[in-house]
Amino acid sequence: MTKIGVFIPIGSRGWLISTTSPATMPSFELNKAVVQQAEHYGLDFALSMIKLRGYNGPSEYWVHNLESFTLMAGLAAVTKKIQLFASVAMLTMPPAVVARMAATIDSIAPGRFGINMVTGWQPKEYQQMGLELTPEHFARRYDYASEYVQVMRDLWTKGVSNFKGEFFQMDDCKLSPRPSAHIPVVGAGQSERGMRFVAEYGDYNFIGAGGDMNQTDGARTMVAKVEAAAKQSGRDTGAFLLLMVIADRTDELAFAKWELYKQGTDIEALEWQASQAGQDTVAKEGSTAAALVRQIKNPQPTGMLKLIGSYEKVAAMLDEIALSTPGLKGIMLTFDDFVIGMEQFGQYIQPLMRSRNPNLKRNLDAA
């Protein structure tokens, strides 16, 4: 069965850079409602990003943000089954501290916690705190991340680290209590080097498939690259596709919402995004930074794959992606309106999905 998760709304406006999209204001209560809905409907995981500064522009996109680890610790205490991933901006916290934070959340939710590794791409986000995303950082960020994960894994598995690397030197560094189970590490490596990092040190790689609408075959190339990198590293790293669902009772109602959001596209925010991402002078064509710069050339509220339509149509498109993309292990959903969208998915979309209902698939195959 294809795994399904949700990328929760930890930042204002969710994932729509628009003044006419739902004015999502992040709070614990909102995210608790979304994650408890997700758990109720049998979703497999919830992931929260880390963003320390938003964009310029009237939409106030990501201007208001919660902190990822503390949010997920709270959510760990009010859920029972769903897997939870927090994100760490690696330049802001030492790996030994993050390893202890993860072990603490594991004691709240044994076996249900993981970490998303973030190297950073928006220079001003770090400059405001006296940190720099220099060209040297951009060139060596995944070397830094590799050492970071090695330190954490030392502490989680052995309770002590004497790791000696270029970026980190541990001196009888201790951690106790250790986690009750393996803590998965995930990333969103889109470049060749990023994919290699996740293949060598991660459990899953979250990928995009561009900003197209209702395209069900766009992830195949990226999934194949993730699989190739994993094979080269001798590991099985799963690819998870990020996409947005905008659904309603009919195609017409769903597309009307998208047209409304497009009317409010925040050009100033997109220009800010491009100017910040463009400072990564070592970024290559397949990288996240390159994709963010490219978005200003075709301005729209989101640069991710969008599935727009009736409940039946969205269910069919999700099945097409899940069942006809070789190597794809799962899908991570965002919604235009998270509370309504999660309810729509659980009540009307997921029950129609063969990829989520093995009995339904068997019955249809036998018909």
From Swiss-Prot:
What's the protein called, per UniProt? Pyrimidine monooxygenase RutA
Q: Which residues form the signal peptide?
A: none
User: What Pfam families does this protein map onto?
Assistant: Bac_luciferase
EC assignment: 1.14.99.46
The text of the family note is: Belongs to the NtaA/SnaA/DszA monooxygenase family. RutA subfamily.
The gene that this protein is the product of is rutA
Q: Which keywords has UniProt assigned to this entry?
A: Flavoprotein, FMN, Monooxygenase, NADP, Oxidoreductase, Plasmid
Q: What is catalyzed by this enzyme?
A: uracil + FMNH2 + NADH + O2 = (Z)-3-ureidoacrylate + FMN + NAD(+) + H2O + H(+); thymine + FMNH2 + NADH + O2 = (Z)-2-methylureidoacrylate + FMN + NAD(+) + H2O + H(+)
Which SUPFAM superfamilies does this one have? Bacterial luciferase-like
**What is an example of a GO molecular function annotated in this UniProt entry?**
uracil oxygenase activity
What's its job? The FMN-N(5)-oxide reacts spontaneously with NADH to produce FMN. Requires the flavin reductase RutF to regenerate FMN in vivo.
| Class of enzymatic activity (EC top level) | oxidoreductase
Single Gene Ontology BP annotation: uracil catabolic process
Instruction: Provide the residue positions that the database annotates as binding FMN.
Output: I50, K51, N116, E125, R141, Y142, S191
Matching InterPro entries:
Luciferase-like_dom, Luciferase-like_sf, Pyrimidine_monooxygenase_RutA, SsuD_RutA_monooxygenase
PANTHER family annotated for this entry? ALKANESULFONATE MONOOXYGENASE, ALKANESULFONATE MONOOXYGENASE-RELATED
Please give the HAMAP family that the UniProt record associates with this protein. RutA (MF_01699)
